[in-house]
Design a protein with these regions (language model features):
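Adenosine-nucleotide cofactor-binding segment
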Residues: 205-208, 220-287
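Glycine-rich beta-strand-centered segment in the early N-terminal region that forms part
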Residues: 29-45, 55-106, 111, 119, ...
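Acidic carboxylate diad motif detector
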Residues: 303-304
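NAD(P)H dinucleotide-binding glycine-rich loop of Rossmann-like/cofactor-binding domains
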Residues: 101-202, 206, 351
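C-terminal substrate-binding/catalytic core of Rossmann-like NAD(P)-dependent dehydrogenases/reductases
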Residues: 2, 257-266, 270-271, 308-351
Length: 351
């Protein structure tokens, strides 16, 4: 069938993109779903920083590639071995397709699925193929179009593995439902799955993008006693305060990180730091801040996606002598079929 997609022609073109035009809307040919796959009509898609990370070459991927991964859609067709959704269902799209058989999947960590991660890196579906192609005028032009993260959501229609979709309550407005498969599960999941914060814990969130705000909502829902938010933009801090943050700290590019860390710690009990600090921006400096404001015995979680060459260094003795924990969180350490319905229910309860 014919579809229209936003196709990245080449990574790393110079900004402004309005001038270099790395993305072109193209008419493509979409092959029908295989036995384990579904055809989805995309309703809404979010623009996530992970899309930009591919465009600017921070996350190298093969091109040309149909972009988009944070979306909601309606099932139009199912393969004969699909039993988790049916035609007409509204679904949230998930950007790590899980195979269900590798060690990660069998131990309840589908976000780190070996097969799914390999397919994503190659720009293919879990079956090892692309379903998108285009007509070419020259034999040297690439015909195959790759799929971003098994979703390719910036399209009118897309084929995905059955494990890339989760049925959701159709009463949720699709413009909000679109973010549940990425920003929501990544931010909320970092708090409730990766860190597993306790009721009454003190929390800090460094970086207020979409994922950072979802972490804030997760900390509020989990019953954090105090929440410190840190960002470069005052408007984001103001919104975070309205949502329930206890303290808002404005950083600037000229701020000394050591001074900033000390000023944030002064907002905590006895100036020792917070129980849990979440790094949500994906940079070395923000992780240094998050680690620096974590109390002895506390936990630092990083869920931001940095450039592959970004380095972070700490004094090793602080891990040992202060019994610190430093954890990574990808896709909110979630099990999508379990967590997305839970978070949808929290949304319906105004949490």
């Amino acid at each position: 069938m014919k579809v229209k997609s936003a196709v990245l022609q080449e990574m790393g073109r110079p900004t402004p993109y309005a001038k270099s035009k790395p993305i072109v809307i193209e008419e493509l040919e979409l092959a029908p779903p295989h036995d384990e796959e579904v055809l989805v009509k995309l309703l809404y898609a979010g623009l996530c920083h992970s899309d930009l990370s591919v465009i600017n070459a921070s996350r190298p991927r093969p091109t040309p590639m149909a972009l988009g991964h944070e979306a909601v859609g309606r099932i139009q067709q199912v393969g004969k071995n699909v039993d988790n959704v049916q035609v007409g269902d509204i679904v949230s799209c998930v950007f790590v397709p899980s195979c269900g058989t590798c060690d990660s999947c069998r131990t309840g960590r589908p976000a780190t699925c070996t097969t799914g991660s390999k397919a994503n890196g190659a720009g293919l579906l879990l079956c090892g193929q692309s379903h998108l192609s285009r007509q070419v005028s020259k034999p040297t032009d690439p015909k195959v179009i790759h799929h971003l993260l098994g979703v390719a959501a910036f399209s009118t229609y897309s084929v995905m593995n059955k494990n890339s979709v989760v049925k959701i309550d159709p009463s949720i407005p699709p413009k909000y439902a679109a973010v549940f498969g990425c920003a929501v599960i990544t931010g909320v999941g970092a708090v409730v799955n990766t860190a597993k914060i306790e009721f009454g814990a003190s929390v800090a969130i460094v970086g207020l993008g979409g994922v950072g705000f979802c972490a804030l909502l997760g900390a509020l829902a989990a019953g954090a006693s105090s929440i410190i938010v840190v960002d470069l933009e005052q408007s984001k801090l103001d919104l975070a305060k309205k949502l329930g943050a206890s303290h808002a700290v404005l950083s600037t590019k000229d701020t000394s990180l050591d001074n900033l860390i000390q000023s944030i710690k002064q907002l905590t009990r006895q100036g020792r730091g917070v129980d849990y600090a979440f790094e949500m921006a994906g940079s070395g400096p923000t992780l240094k801040i998050a680690y620096g404001i974590t109390r002895p015995g506390g936990t630092t979680v990083t869920a931001g996606l940095p450039h592959p060459e970004t380095q972070f260094s700490i004094s090793q003795v602080t891990i040992t002598a202060e019994e610190r924990t430093l954890k990574g969180s990808y896709l909110g350490s979630c099990v999508p079929t379990r967590d997305i319905p839970r978070y949808v229910q929290l949304y319906k309860e105004d949490q």
